């Protein structure tokens, strides 16, 4: 499985080789770079013609046995109910549902799974797994089942209620939501923009924050689950396709005050683990990723990346030397004045992240 926000890579981790994520495109292992890696082009499922033309019997005068009555064609309703071809091949979505039905854990991203032919939130989730694997059902099924295993073991929804260390994580990450109006239409998901913010300049001690690997990964997963709550796939009524998917989030990684010359083993280990966990279990959730306050040397590194990753992938990564220019990036959006809604620190006129944003619980 290829590995893909979703987000990650922590401060102190030096740029490394480009890695691939199932769902977020080819993401470089650079500070802040996490999933959300991969492949978005989906293969069309093979359509099996239920009726093959039969050769015409030769004409002669010998008596012939009565021909078997022709089988009636399924009605559209029957086809939808069975979600199969006459060859017995289930549709890609139905195959994923059949696999998920046999699992003990029935939830992904806060959504109780159900038949995707009748439950749009499940259709969205399953289609994301297909999109992350270029429409290859077996690969999507493998990733889906492993995600169910991981969620059963980790119980990430419970991390939303966990108390994290204020000394380690306060001010490190936020989730903000900006809408076209007070109550955007539920059938127009494009009228809502969800951001996750990773402020690595707020880290007081790399060893303290990243030293306990499990604790840091749990905090990062809690931030991701908060973002998913804001996207609200469970309330969606508009399905997605291989080419249309508005249920994604923008990720911002701010490195203001971080020295890229400082590299600690614990920070690199935390980055590596986050990339794996988020890439494996949160495919196709990245809309755009902005790397802010990046030193000039990192800008040079991104120039070199053009030699190794596709243009489609690069279009999602935006290294910027100054965070104050971020607001200018949001022109083509259905949320009017989105740039102005961002905090002043990022070129907008909105409230600061501590006032407006949501974050995992710290104490």
Curated annotation (Swiss-Prot):
<feature type="binding site">
    <location>
        <position position="289"/>
    </location>
    <ligand>
        <name>heme</name>
    </ligand>
</feature>
<dbReference type="GO" id="GO:0032541">
    <property type="term" value="C:cortical endoplasmic reticulum"/>
</dbReference>
<feature type="binding site" description="proximal binding residue">
    <location>
        <position position="255"/>
    </location>
    <ligand>
        <name>heme</name>
    </ligand>
</feature>
<feature type="binding site">
    <location>
        <position position="253"/>
    </location>
    <ligand>
        <name>heme</name>
    </ligand>
</feature>
<dbReference type="Pfam" id="PF00650">
    <property type="entry name" value="CRAL_TRIO"/>
</dbReference>
<keyword id="KW-0472">Membrane</keyword>
<dbReference type="GO" id="GO:0017157">
    <property type="term" value="P:regulation of exocytosis"/>
</dbReference>
<dbReference type="GO" id="GO:0043001">
    <property type="term" value="P:Golgi to plasma membrane protein transport"/>
</dbReference>
<dbReference type="GO" id="GO:0005789">
    <property type="term" value="C:endoplasmic reticulum membrane"/>
</dbReference>
<keyword id="KW-0349">Heme</keyword>
<keyword id="KW-0408">Iron</keyword>
<feature type="domain" description="CRAL-TRIO">
    <location>
        <begin position="180"/>
        <end position="354"/>
    </location>
</feature>
<dbReference type="GO" id="GO:0008526">
    <property type="term" value="F:phosphatidylinositol transfer activity"/>
</dbReference>
<dbReference type="GO" id="GO:0005886">
    <property type="term" value="C:plasma membrane"/>
</dbReference>
<feature type="compositionally biased region" description="Basic and acidic residues">
    <location>
        <begin position="36"/>
        <end position="46"/>
    </location>
</feature>
<comment type="function">
    <text>Non-classical phosphatidylinositol (PtdIns) transfer protein (PITP), which exhibits PtdIns-binding/transfer activity in the absence of detectable PtdCho-binding/transfer activity. Regulates PtdIns(4,5)P2 homeostasis at the plasma membrane. Heme-binding protein that may play a role in organic oxidant-induced stress responses.</text>
</comment>
<dbReference type="InterPro" id="IPR042938">
    <property type="entry name" value="Sfh5"/>
</dbReference>
<feature type="compositionally biased region" description="Low complexity">
    <location>
        <begin position="64"/>
        <end position="76"/>
    </location>
</feature>
<comment type="similarity">
    <text>Belongs to the SFH5 family.</text>
</comment>
<dbReference type="GO" id="GO:0046872">
    <property type="term" value="F:metal ion binding"/>
</dbReference>
<dbReference type="InterPro" id="IPR001251">
    <property type="entry name" value="CRAL-TRIO_dom"/>
</dbReference>
<dbReference type="InterPro" id="IPR036273">
    <property type="entry name" value="CRAL/TRIO_N_dom_sf"/>
</dbReference>
<feature type="binding site">
    <location>
        <position position="220"/>
    </location>
    <ligand>
        <name>heme</name>
    </ligand>
</feature>
<dbReference type="InterPro" id="IPR036865">
    <property type="entry name" value="CRAL-TRIO_dom_sf"/>
</dbReference>
<feature type="binding site">
    <location>
        <position position="200"/>
    </location>
    <ligand>
        <name>heme</name>
    </ligand>
</feature>
<feature type="region of interest" description="Disordered">
    <location>
        <begin position="1"/>
        <end position="84"/>
    </location>
</feature>
<protein>
    <recommendedName>
        <fullName>Phosphatidylinositol transfer protein sfh-5</fullName>
    </recommendedName>
</protein>
<keyword id="KW-0479">Metal-binding</keyword>
<keyword id="KW-0256">Endoplasmic reticulum</keyword>
<keyword id="KW-0445">Lipid transport</keyword>
<keyword id="KW-0813">Transport</keyword>
<keyword id="KW-0492">Microsome</keyword>
<dbReference type="GO" id="GO:0005829">
    <property type="term" value="C:cytosol"/>
</dbReference>
<keyword id="KW-0963">Cytoplasm</keyword>
